[in-house]
Amino acid sequence: LDRIGLLVCTTEGIYLPKDRCDQIVHMIRGYFEDTGQELPETLTLEDFAAFFFPGSVMVDSVEDFEGAPIKFPLLTPPKQTQQLSVYLREALPQTVTPMVSGFGAIDLVRTGVNKATGLKDLCERLNADPAGILAFGDGENDMEMLRYAGWGVAMSNAPEVVRNAADEVIGSNEEQAVLDYVEQLLDRLEASQ
C-alpha cells in the first residue's frame, strides 16, 4: 500500500491508509484546482471517501485489509495522467494493467479483468446474448466493454482511441447525451409497438 496506491479495493471493501490522509487530500485539491473547481477548505479525507467511495475503511497498515485486491485506484495530476499511464504500462509486471478511468485517475487492475469481462460473466449467468447489450463509455477503461457489447456508444469528449472502439459517437457528458439517446431509443421502441 505504501508503494503502490492510495486506495486498495477488495471484494470486502475499499481501504484507505490513515498515514496518507494529508497527501490524499492535497492530491484531491490539486485535481480540482487543475479542473478549475474549488473545494471547501474544511474538506477531509473522510468527506471525500464517503462521497466517492461509500463504505470505505481507514486502515493503519496493509495487513489490516481483508480480501484479495481487485484494483488500486490512483489519483494523478490530470495533465500527467496519459504520460503516467504509459510509464506504468512499461514499469509494471505484465500481470497488472493501468487503465485510465477518468480525468486524473488510473486504476491498476489484473491484466484481463475489465468491464467487458464483467459483462461477459453477467451474460453467462443470465444466459443473455451480448448482441443485446447497449453500452456507453467515455474513458479508456470502457474500450473493451464498448467492443464486447452488441452496440457500443462513446461520448464525443472521450479520447480518440475510445471513440474508435465504439460503433457510434454521440454528444458529450455535459450535454446529457446518454439521457437523450436512451429517451430517443425508448420513444422509438414505444412507437414500434
Place the predicted regions along the sequence by residue:
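Mg2+-dependent phosphoryl-transfer enzymes with acidic/Ser/Thr/Gly-rich catalytic loops
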Residues: 106-193
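Conserved acidic, metal-coordinating active-site core of Asp-based
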Residues: 2-134
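Anion (oxyanion) recognition and catalysis
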Residues: 1-2, 163
